[in-house]
Amino acid sequence: MYPAHLLVLLAVCVSLLGASAILPLPLNLVQFTYLIQCANKGSRASYHYADYGCYCGAGGSGTPVDELDRCCKIHDDCYGEAEKMGCYPKLTMYNYYCGTEGPYCSTKTDCQRYVCACDLQAAKCFARSPYNNKNYNIDTSKRCK
C-alpha cells in the first residue's frame, strides 16, 4: 500500500471517530414543521416560529410575551413531560397525516403518540394565535425575565 493511501485511510478513520462525538440533530423537527404547515395552510412559513418571543425556538425563560409564545411554552412543557416518561421528544419519529380538516396523529408507541400530540397541540395553537411581528427576534435578555 502506498503511503498516500495510508494517510487517506487514517484521515477517514479520524473523521469517523470525530463524527461519533457529534450529537444527533432533532429528527422530528421536520415533522413538526410539516404539522405547522398543515395546521396553518396558506399562512406564514414555519421558520417564523423559530425565534419568536421567549419560548419559540431553543430554550425559554420568563413570562411568555403573548398567546403565540404561550403555545411554545406549553409545547416545551409537553416535551418536558415526555422526557419524564422516558421519551426523547426531539428524536422521536411518529406517523401523522395532513387531512382536509388539518393534521392528525396516527402512530403506535406511547412515546410516539405523546410526542405527536405535543406537536399537534402546538401546531393548532399556532394556527389560532395572532402573530405579532414585534415579538420576532426580540432581545430575550431584556424581555424574558
From Swiss-Prot:
One of its GO terms (molecular function) is calcium ion binding. Residues 1-21 form the signal peptide. The keyword Heme does not apply. Residues 22-27 form a propeptide. It holds the Pfam family Phospholip_A2_1. GO terms for biological process: arachidonate secretion; lipid catabolic process; phospholipid metabolic process. The active site is at H75, D119. Keywords: Calcium, Disulfide bond, Hydrolase, Lipid degradation, Lipid metabolism, Metal-binding, Secreted, Signal. Expressed by the venom gland. Its EC number is 3.1.1.4. Ca(2+) binds at Y55, G57, G59, D76. It catalyses: a 1,2-diacyl-sn-glycero-3-phosphocholine + H2O = a 1-acyl-sn-glycero-3-phosphocholine + a fatty acid + H(+). It is found in: Secreted. Its cofactor is Ca(2+). Its main location: secreted. It comes from the Eukaryota. Disulfide bonds join C38-C98, C54-C144, C56-C72, C71-C125, C78-C118, C87-C111, C105-C116. Binds 1 Ca(2+) ion. One of its GO terms (cellular component) is extracellular region. PANTHER family: PHOSPHOLIPASE A2 (PTHR11716:SF51), PHOSPHOLIPASE A2 FAMILY MEMBER (PTHR11716). PLA2 catalyzes the calcium-dependent hydrolysis of the 2-acyl groups in 3-sn-phosphoglycerides. Belongs to the phospholipase A2 family. Group I subfamily. D49 sub-subfamily. This is Basic phospholipase A2 cL037.
